[in-house]
Amino acid sequence: MAPATSEPRLRQTSSILYIAVDSIIPPRGKGVRGLDQFTAILDHQGIPAVWLTNRSRLQFDEPRRKHGHTHPFIAEEGCAVYLPEGYFHLRPESAAGRKPQKAPTLRLGRFVCIPIAVALPVASQALADLSEDLAVPVVPLRALSPRELSQNTGLPQREAELARQRDFDELFFFAGSSNDEIERFLAEGRRRKLLFRPQGVLWSVAIGASVQRCIRELSRLYDRALRYHAHVVGIATPELAPGLFPFCERTLLLSDRDPAEHPHSEVSGIRRQHVLLHSEDLWARVLDVLALKS
């Protein structure tokens, strides 16, 4: 992997990009072409690009290496912020209370992690307790054999193993439950402060995950490093936009359909722009749009 960008190399920039990449570089199949060149251009221009994913830290390592991404990323759908070693020389601060407090951090692999959700195995135990209390059977991925894991995720065995090695959330599926049982399970879980997110045929459960808090913590670090506020710009496809756009100051929707067909990605009071997802010059168009200063 290329060396991480460090704080002294942060240059004057009006914006920090937050890009939801799971539909741009999907776990299976071909991704959108040109992302690596786009990443290189952003680096050359000194524009940080934070990637957001529902994948795990280990699962996300290969896509980051392949596309030359050396900036922070938000993984497990808002469970934590991961900072490459040496990226900032600033200690994260919490906004709680009148005076800024040192935010707790973890060392996970090559990264300094700002945890937002409660770390495993707390969510795993809460899931097991809920399943037992309601007599609704669930199967966590960690309980599967390597062959069963690959079959249920649709991933090659090595990638499937990385997918279930999580830091904060637990992946699982329901085992023969009716729709009514599933709804009852989810409702009771939410009452217990569990956060459920669908991921295809799978579900994830976490405690305290929040994309908004991830962006807030990271934006505070960038503002301190730059000594001014850089605008939060969100970039996403329609299916991922609702989880990102409400927390951004400016948004860019990547879609081949008319933006009016995606009302769920509209956010009141936020300037939204649109670029055709599968246009030949997608990333050049994105750069053109980003060059338009508010």
Where are these regions (language model features)?
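Non-catalytic pre-domain segments flanking phosphatase-related domains
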Residues: M1-V21, K66
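Mg2+-dependent phosphoryl-transfer enzymes with acidic/Ser/Thr/Gly-rich catalytic loops
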Residues: P8, Q12, V32-G34, V201-S294
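Hydrophobic "anchor" residues
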Residues: I24-P27
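Active-site phosphate-binding/coordination module
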Residues: G31-L141
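Residue-level detector of anion-binding/catalytic polar loops
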Residues: P48, L195, R250-T251
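Short hydrophobic/aromatic-enriched beta-strand-loop microsegments
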Residues: T70-E76, R158-E159, T251-D256
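Short, surface-exposed amphipathic charged segments that create phosphate/polyanion-binding patches used
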Residues: Y87-P92, T153-P156, D288-K293
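Conserved acidic, metal-coordinating active-site core of Asp-based
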Residues: L130-V233, E239
